[in-house]
């Protein structure tokens, strides 16, 4: 800390409270490669080894963490509510000399509904992924109907084994029912005991589970178990008759992605996207810890699995690929207090660095200014406002899906319209802030597009004169497709 800063604080007669002491505790896990940068609202820093606290910060190297408070200045003399946002990202500049080894399970639905072109396209997409794997990667192939069959046990890729795995894919035939939970159990076993690798399941289905586990909560528990073992599951729903709630839940709880493929011809693109992300993975076992200052309370954690231990929120974030970002949003209650700087939270990010081949970490701290001067109060940070909008938009899409499934089409559209109005209000407020940037505007644009597509997709034109009565909206192909598109959009917005 600068001598001038010490003198100024002494001249003002300020003393350190217990909260201030908390905020200045040294952080042993600070990554020496990762400088901390941010805007003003700086509290005294007694030494160069300690993080500076402020209303926003960015820290890290291979993987970065950006922390932001929704409101940098809050009203004195009353309880306040604000948001904390953490963005975990790799900008693509850090690259390993060679890709991290992959431990992949390809899981394909072979129930009767997959016959024909769907199965052909699924097999071809999987073959493309096998062809792109590096020597030393490990792959398993599982096909499932009423039960799961491991067609290829965990196999290390070389030129001979690559051909054998490809031939095994050609032998998949569509028959029987659908047991997704059986397939996930088999994938979990196939991926076991492979330390130092990036573990991924690519699960494809076109239908409802008709055998085994059938409830969303059961799949959430199963997916959490896989996540805790370092396994993420990316789910691919084909056509319009699969259960989007189950596939979304699997992906969300395991830190994977969810895809909707209306036309099976697009499967190759999805498989390519997944394998490119795997090849560009720079970190695994990534975990955020948000250590709240005394008195700060959690009101809600949005969109992500977490556990709370005292004042600490522990949030697993899975793998991070170059160019990828993942976010955490938390609504906080800040109790009334005296004017001055108020510590809010420390944020620590820890991960297995696949570029430097070591454990990596970085951190920073967030603090707000408590003021009785109304002129100093700040509107919500535009990036936080956009992220709040994403959670609200994702929820509105899911709410609209539920209403639509009940045949309450007008109510579904009203829910979407109401969220669009709220989104426009948030955007207008954000645009007035001095640090508004095009990136935040693009975030709002993406949400607006998702809401517009949903409203349009749910619209049901009246049948022409003399035509037979139309099917109920939820039973039409258009309605089913829009419901699944909404679920995919919601999963992406919440990521």
Per-region residue spans from a language model:
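Exposed acidic/Ser/Thr-rich ligand/metal-binding surfaces
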Residues: 2-3, 22-29, 50-52, 66-72, ...
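Hydrophobic membrane-insertion alpha-helices, especially the h-region
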Residues: 8-20
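Long, acidic serine/threonine- and proline-rich intrinsically disordered regions
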Residues: 19-30, 334-495
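Ser/Thr/Pro/Gly-rich low-complexity linker/stalk segments immediately outside membranes or between
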Residues: 26-41
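Short aromatic-acidic-glycine turn motif
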Residues: 149-153, 293-301, 354-358
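Extracellular adhesion/glycan-binding regions together with long Ser/Thr-
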Residues: 301-325
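Low-complexity, intrinsically disordered segments enriched in Ser/Thr together with acidic residues
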Residues: 321-339
């Amino acid at each position: 800390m600068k001598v001038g800063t010490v003198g100024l604080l002494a001249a003002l007669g300020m003393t350190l409270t217990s909260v201030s002491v908390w905020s200045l505790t040294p952080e042993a896990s600070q990554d020496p490669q990762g400088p901390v940068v941010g805007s003003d609202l700086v509290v005294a820093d007694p030494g160069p080894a300690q993080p500076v606290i402020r209303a926003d910060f960015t820290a890290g190297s291979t993987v970065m963490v950006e922390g932001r408070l929704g409101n940098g200045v809050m009203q004195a003399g009353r309880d306040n509510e604000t948001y904390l946002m953490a963005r975990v990202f790799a900008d693509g500049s850090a690259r390993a000399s060679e890709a991290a080894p992959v431990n992949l399970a390809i899981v394909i639905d072979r129930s009767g509904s997959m016959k024909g072109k769907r199965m052909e396209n699924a097999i071809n997409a999987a073959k493309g992924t096998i062809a792109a794997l590096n020597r030393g990667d490990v792959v398993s192939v599982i096909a499932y109907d009423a039960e799961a069959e491991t067609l290829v046990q965990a196999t290390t890729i070389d030129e001979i084994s690559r051909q054998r795995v490809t031939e095994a894919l050609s032998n998949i035939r569509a028959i029987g029912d659908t047991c997704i939970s059986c397939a996930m159990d088999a994938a979990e076993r196939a991926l076991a005991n492979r330390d130092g690798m990036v573990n991924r399941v690519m699960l494809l289905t076109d239908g409802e589970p008709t055998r085994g586990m059938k409830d969303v909560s059961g799949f959430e528990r199963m997916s959490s178990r896989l996540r805790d073992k370092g396994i993420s599951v990316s789910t691919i729903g084909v056509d319009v008759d699969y259960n989007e709630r189950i596939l979304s839940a699997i992906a969300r709880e395991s830190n994977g992605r969810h895809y909707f493929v209306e036309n099976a011809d697009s499967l190759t693109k999805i498989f390519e996207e997944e394998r490119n992300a795997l090849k560009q993975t720079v970190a695994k076992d990534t975990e955020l810890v948000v250590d709240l200052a005394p008195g700060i309370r959690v009101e809600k954690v949005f969109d992500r699995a977490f556990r709370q231990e005292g004042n600490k929120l522990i949030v697993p974030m899975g793998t991070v690929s170059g160019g990828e970002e993942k976010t955490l949003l938390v609504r906080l209650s800040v109790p009334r207090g005296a004017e001055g700087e108020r510590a809010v939270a420390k944020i620590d990010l820890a991960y297995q660095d696949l570029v430097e081949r070591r454990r990596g970490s970085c951190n920073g701290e967030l603090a707000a200014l408590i003021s009785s001067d109304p002129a100093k109060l700040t509107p919500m940070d535009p990036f936080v406002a956009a992220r709040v909008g994403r959670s609200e938009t994702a929820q509105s899409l899911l709410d609209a899906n539920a209403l639509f499934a009940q045949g309450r089409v007008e109510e579904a559209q009203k829910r979407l319209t109401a969220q669009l109005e709220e989104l426009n209000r948030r955007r207008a407020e954000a645009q007035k802030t001095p640090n508004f940037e095009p990136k935040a505007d693009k975030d709002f644009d993406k949400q607006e597009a998702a809401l517009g597509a949903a409203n349009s997709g749910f619209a049901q034109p009246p049948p022409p004169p003399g035509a037979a009565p139309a099917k109920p909206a939820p039973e039409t192909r258009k309605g089913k497709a829009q419901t699944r598109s909404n679920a995919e959009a919601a999963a992406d917005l919440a990521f």
